[in-house]
């Protein structure tokens, strides 16, 4: 039986109308006077810290702790502003699926497994009134490697539940092959939604446990029952 459900954010729970990508570019332009710097980055399934480090190296700037702090201070400022200017939203089926999880006879804990830095995740999810849904999580400022973020999320979930969780008791929900890979790294089950930028057929090739068009196409009882 699933005891912990870990959600990715962008392309899985919400889409921000480009606010996150724009905030990356504006922060770098504002803090380091280099415009259009984020246009070459591939964001899907990546961690914010890994993306920022790549951006620094592409522009011959030292990715020092001080420079990263300066960048992310600018990023969260712009993210908060741009979310009010872009047309994003909660993706289809998310609220109903969460309601179904809460209604299970033994509801699992709900957490986040995301490449977003924690403050960025909070800003995005508070904007869409989803932040309070989650009890635990691991983030892009915990580690640059998503597999390590998954391990941290598993450990935090175990502490929350006062139970050393086995991988098969965890369900990871995401929209990219990287979500599948990090779930496999901790032995978790995978539910993948084709609501992000990756085509259904490409996701299918990675053989997740469940693959659906969106969360309207699956019931919590299907994916959280006894194994």
Where are these regions (language model features)?
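Active-site neighborhood of HAD-like aspartate-dependent phosphohydrolases
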Residues: 1-44, 50, 56-58
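Short, acidic loop-to-helix structural element flanking the phosphoryl-transfer center
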Residues: 6, 65, 80-112, 118
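An amphipathic alpha-helix signature
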Residues: 21-25, 49, 53, 72, ...
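Short, surface-exposed acidic
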Residues: 32-42, 60-71, 131-134, 163-167
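Substrate-recognition "cap/lid" segment bordering the active-site pocket of phosphatases
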Residues: 88-89, 111, 116-172, 177-186
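Acidic, Mg2+-coordinating phosphoryl-transfer loop and its flanking beta/alpha structural elements
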Residues: 172-210
């Amino acid at each position: 039986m699933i005891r912990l459900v870990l959600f990715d954010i962008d392309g899985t729970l919400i889409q921000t109308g480009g606010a996150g990508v724009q905030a990356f570019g504006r922060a770098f332009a504002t803090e380091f006077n280099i415009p259009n710097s984020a246009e070459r980055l591939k964001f899907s399934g990546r961690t914010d810290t890994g993306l920022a480090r790549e951006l620094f190296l592409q522009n011959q700037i030292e990715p020092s702790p001080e420079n990263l702090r300066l960048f992310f201070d600018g990023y969260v400022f712009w993210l908060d502003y741009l979310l009010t200017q872009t047309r994003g939203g909660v993706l289809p089926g998310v609220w109903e699926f969460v309601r179904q999880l809460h209604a299970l006879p033994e509801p699992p804990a709900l957490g986040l497994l995301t490449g977003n830095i924690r403050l960025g995740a909070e800003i995005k999810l508070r904007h869409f009134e989803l932040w309070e849904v989650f009890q635990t999580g691991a983030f892009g400022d915990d580690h640059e490697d998503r597999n390590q973020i998954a391990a941290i999320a598993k450990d935090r979930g175990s502490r929350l539940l006062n139970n050393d969780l086995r991988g098969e008791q965890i369900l990871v929900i995401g929209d990219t092959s990287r979500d599948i890979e990090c779930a496999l790294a901790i032995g978790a089950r995978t539910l993948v939604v084709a609501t992000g930028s990756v085509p259904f057929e490409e996701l299918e090739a990675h053989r997740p446990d469940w693959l659906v068009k969106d969360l309207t196409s699956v019931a919590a009882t299907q994916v959280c029952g006894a194994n």
